[in-house]
Amino acid sequence: MAGRPHPYDSNSSDPENWDRKLHSRPRKLYKHSSSASRVAKGGVDHTKMSLHGASGGHERSRDRRRSSDRSRDSSHERAESQLTPCIRNVTSPTRQHHIEREKDHSSSRPSSPRPQRASPNGSMSSAGNSSRNSSQSSSDGSCKTSGEMVFVYENAKEGARNVRTSERVTLIVDNTRFVVDPSIFTAQPNTMLGRMFGSGREHNFTRPNEKGEYEVAEGIGSTVFRAILDYYKTGIIRCPDGISIPELREACDYLCISFEYSTIKCRDLSALMHELSNDGARRQFEFYLEEMILPLMVASAQSGERECHIVVLTDDDVVDWDEEYPPQMGEEYSQIIYSTKLYRFFKYIENRDVAKSVLKERGLKKIRLGIEGYPTYKEKVKKRPGGRPEVIYNYVQRPFIRMSWEKEEGKSRHVDFQCVKSKSITNLAAAAADIPQDQLVVMHPTPQVDELDILPSHPASGNNDLDPDAQNPML
């Protein structure tokens, strides 16, 4: 041992101190029994073991490890000397040396199926941790892949074995991928997704893209679609925070999901009741339209009218007009419906908007709905000297509906001929003679059928030169 030089560490500033540490350091780090017996025997055993080839090779590898350990310890001490005392690493050099030796020892072993543990300096995590994290993320329902959110939805009613072997499809909604078991859609066959992955796939109507993914629900946000997917699992849609009820309603209508109080749960009850009231108002007005309004429209149409003005009165209203002095505002052309229920229906502005949309869908035009004053009975008559007496009626505010079914309303107000310059000129040809040539309108460039019918019959060509006043020479 004395004649054999120790390896020199260029990073160490005190080689003699390292030799002294090397001889006095306990050598219990090696777990092999052969190395423990060599440590107990001392320097003479080192000389004997160096005579053998295999032991000499192991001794040289151990010396190389010692040199590398001294290099790490010296670099660690220099790094510690450069740090400020408040952030100095509290790990002692001896403990750090043990950690590094165990790391080198584990790396020198042959590879085994057991996964590596995460090192203190931030090395890669083990396969067990990654599998545990992946299972946790899948149970939470989301994980990130290449910057995009991927949500995994499983059917909770099926066991783990069925879920593992069941079919999965990937839906892309708003650049977000949803991995879903299509059986949850086929359980609701009346919805759009139920038809797509039910009869649509059977008849090859639903086709994926080149990556095998399905792009569905265009125009619907990913947050809304996540809430709608809960409907296929639990039968309830909980409105997410920040999503309005009209937006959720539009998505439900697009996906053919019934929007009912038993299906939708949200905190904004006012918005939910408003949507439910719109549905009820539509159904109610369609009933009123068929039972009360349409018969009056038919009566107006049978009399030759192409529009109808309807006033809704209550059941208690009494209309008593004076035949000698009727109202002078044209109310005599109005149709009257006595219905307190319809009066209460049109009292709300939202219901009038719903009724207007229904009438537009039915093809009617010039729709006006509102509340106006309607005369009910005569209160008094003011007689003016030398003039028409003034009649004062009692007016009540009642709803009214006005609509038209005139197809060519624009042409009825169009003048089809050139107006004459003066009322005294009754001959259109004479009036047209005074019109400049650039504004002259040719009335009938070709003879019409009715003109040919009234043309006088021409006499024979031989009688054209005879004087009608001359006497007949034969007489």
Swiss-Prot record:
Residues 146-475 are annotated as: Interaction with AKT family members. Keywords: Cytoplasm, Nucleus. InterPro entries: BTB/POZ_dom, BTBD10/KCTD20, BTBD10/KCTD20_BTB/POZ, SKP1/BTB/POZ_sf. Residues 1-144, 451-475 are annotated as: Disordered. It comes from the Eukaryota. Residues 81-94 have a biased composition (Polar residues). GO terms for biological process: positive regulation of phosphatidylinositol 3-kinase/protein kinase B signal transduction. Ubiquitously expressed (at protein level). It holds the Pfam family BTB_3. Residues 108-144 have a biased composition (Low complexity). Residues 22-31 have a biased composition (Basic residues). Residues 167-241 form the BTB domain. It is found in: Nucleus; Cytoplasm. The keyword Zinc-finger does not apply. GO terms for cellular component: cytoplasm; fibrillar center; nucleoplasm. Residues 57-80, 97-107 have a biased composition (Basic and acidic residues). Plays a major role as an activator of AKT family members by inhibiting PPP2CA-mediated dephosphorylation, thereby keeping AKTs activated. Plays a role in preventing motor neuronal death and in accelerating the growth of pancreatic beta cells. Interacts (via C-terminal 330-amino-acid region) with AKT1; AKT2 and AKT3. Interacts with PPP2CA and PPP1CA. This is BTB/POZ domain-containing protein 10. It comes from Mus musculus (Mouse).
